[in-house]
Structures are given as structure tokens and as C-alpha cells.
Amino acid sequence: TRYELTGLEAYTEYEVRIRALVVSGNYLDSEWSAWERFKTLDKTIADEFDGGSGTEEDPYLIARPSQLALLAQCVNEQTAGYFEPDVHYLLTADLDLSGYENWTPIGTGPQDGRYPYENPEKAFQGVFDGGGHTVNNLNVAYTGATTFTSVGLFGVNDGTIRNLHVAGAVSATTSCTDKSYVIAGGIVGFNIIAYEDAMNTRPGSGAIEHCSFTGSVSASCGNDPTGTADAGGICGMAESGNIDFCETTLDAAHTIRTEGGEISMTGGIAGSMNGGRISACTFTGTGVLEAAFNTLPEGYYVYAQAGGIVGSTAEASIESCTADFGGSLLIPKGGEA
């Protein structure tokens, strides 16, 4: 027999017990059952946050998966009062994202083919404090045809993300066939300080601090022979900004992998770092780090790098980091590890 309860609040715990009623005699003919506890399903996207006003002293509170999805919606739709640089968020509980088959990143980037620093709209620009909590069962599985693709829990970060732990799987594949950029990271896909801030940078802009990731990350250029793929446990590509006190754990069942056209860069912390700093970060595990190519056509210059902390650096500093990796490091002939 199936019973339906109506009028219940979403994502709320209830207790229920039952007792049989004989209708013909209109009397109860059994003892009460034991109390059973259950929790109602969450909405896909919440109507409001759990509290707060968005200031540093009174941040917007996130206690449910649907409220994290609301943050993604507010940033990606540029909702006034929720996406600006001075808006603060605080995670107040561990979250399980298993109800989202394909998570929409917080900050998708411009989605118009340009780098986010050329058009920083739809980047996360505020301050997100994870409160030491964990986001479990993250699943990002992007497939599309955009020239620039950046995915992670956060797609593009131009703000501050701190005190956050994430476990799950992040992947991106493009069907674009010319000069594509495909970037994937466990916490952040693409980390930047927008060019408009370069002369007067906001404090904390492009910062990832005290974060950790456990799981798999992959970025593939599909059939594009001219594409660039970057993947990292914390961040796929950092054009600038700082990554401090972060950690990636790559268990035996997990992989961080790129499949590029011309360029393929894979790192335990970041795939590539083109400015800024990585400091006091740790990479451990027994899984697989791989920088591969979709094709090796004649006439193309190809470039592959993989490393425990970062695959490739340019005008960036690496300070006080450690890598204790007992897994497999795979690169094509001629690549660098």
C-alpha cells in the first residue's frame, strides 16, 4: 500500500508512524508502528538563501544544495545584489550534490568565445567562505561547441573562494573544431584578476585559499587539432591570482587528464599558471596524471606538460609546495613532466 503525504516543506526532516483502521467497523485494530524518519527532497533551485544580507558581517547563508544552485543562477544571470565584488556568502553545512546529474558551474564566463578577462561578466566576483564544509558528489559533465569552456564547481573565479572541500568528478569536452580552449578544475575552472582591475586590484580578487579536492578531472578538445586543454585538481588554468594552502588527493581510482589539440597541460593543483602564485599547496595520491593529444597531425607544433603541482608556469611563482605522488604520470613522446 502506498501513502502520500502532502503539504510538506522541501529539504525538511519529518517523523511518521502508522496504524491500521478497519473502515467497516470504524475502529483501530493494530498497534502503532515504530517511528520512521525521512527527509523530503530539495528543490532544484531555491527561492531564497538561508539568511543574511550579503555583507561581510552578515553574509548570505547557504545550507542546502538548492541554495548553492541559486548562487550559480544569480551569478550566471547577473542578478543585481548577488553577483557584485562586495557580496559575501557562507556555507553552513556539508552538501550532497548527487541530485544534480550535471552541475551548472557558478560563473560560466561570457559564453561568447572570448576569454573572461576580455569580458569578465558571468564570473564569480564575490567572497565565498566554505566554512570548512564539504561539497560531496559534484558531477560536471559539459559537452558543447563554445570556443571557450571553463568548468568546475566554479567555472570562472574573479573573487575569493576559501575554506572549501569538494569531492566529485568534473569533465568538459568541446565539439568546436578551431582554436578551442577547454579548461576544467575541481574547485575552479579558470582563475583570473580581470584586466579592468589590474591597476587597482580588489583585495582577494582571483584568490583560492584553504581548499581541497578529491576526485577526477578531465578536459578534452574533442577533434580540434588546434585546441588547448588544461586540467587541475584545484584550478584548470590560472591567468593570474593566487592559490594558497590548497590540497588535491588523487586516489587510485581517480584521474586528472587532458586531451589537447596543440596544447595539453595537467597538474595536481593547477593545469597551467600564467601569473600569480601557488604557495603551501600539497598534491598526494596513487591515481593517474595524464597530458595527451587527440591527434598528432603533421605541420602542427604540439606541447604537453604534466606535473604534481602545476603542468606549466609562465611569470608565476611556486612556493613551499609538496608533491607525494605514487601513481602514473603519462605524457606523449616529447612532452615534459
Briefly describe each language-model feature range.
Residues 23-42:
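Extracellular fibronectin type III
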Residues 42-337:
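Surface-exposed repetitive/solenoidal architectures
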